[in-house]
Amino acid sequence: MPPLGLHMTVARELARELEQPAIEAERGAYYLGATTPDIRILTRWDRARTHFFDLNEFEEQNGVHRLFEQEPALRDAAALNPATAAFVAGYISHLVMDERYICEIYRPVFGIGSELGGDVRANIMDRVLQFELDRRDREDEEKIDEIRKALAESAVEVSVGFIARDQLLEWRKISVDVLSHPPIWDRFHRLAGRYLAAAGIEGEAGVARFMNEVPALLRTTIERVGIDRIRDYLSGASAEARRKMKEYLS
């Protein structure tokens, strides 16, 4: 699934296209919402609790629908304060981006039902692709500084029943910290540590050998996924997120 940095840069572009007053007034809360489904990294909750999508279900799912089904108090954006409405809009963007990635890229290319069969190498290839997409979208330092500043200055006056405010404040620190560390390849082995360990890639020498192979692995991964599939995913997911966010805030 897209890394936190990519979720925020995509959310920024969606905000520029939508020009919604609630988002413009509360950019920090909005960017926080765009990362918060991954708060389970902090809380250790089950993924489905915050993504409203079960990875073990292979029938069609709609995370945004489940969000409002389980949290009906959030359905009416006009009844919420601007920060909460902006937060939920960002949250919607994350759910859509993840859901489309799972269904359009991970499962058909890397998952159990794919030719790669969901093995450890497939999951490393998936992480390599995610990292590269994040790296490309975060090359503009001015854009990243803008997002980081909005996040850091947000009052986090957000009220959602399924996540406490103190947890959101702690998560905000983590989100800001993510943007403080550019996604350079030297950092990849730390971010993908458990996947490398599962493949038996451990120790300084083992990691060094693997990192030397990353450029070739990235090329192989992009060839397998296909440029068109990547482009269609990014444009299609953004279009769906934009539509659902507009419906929510209108």
Per-region residue spans from a language model:
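N-terminal leader/auxiliary helical segments
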Residues: 1-250
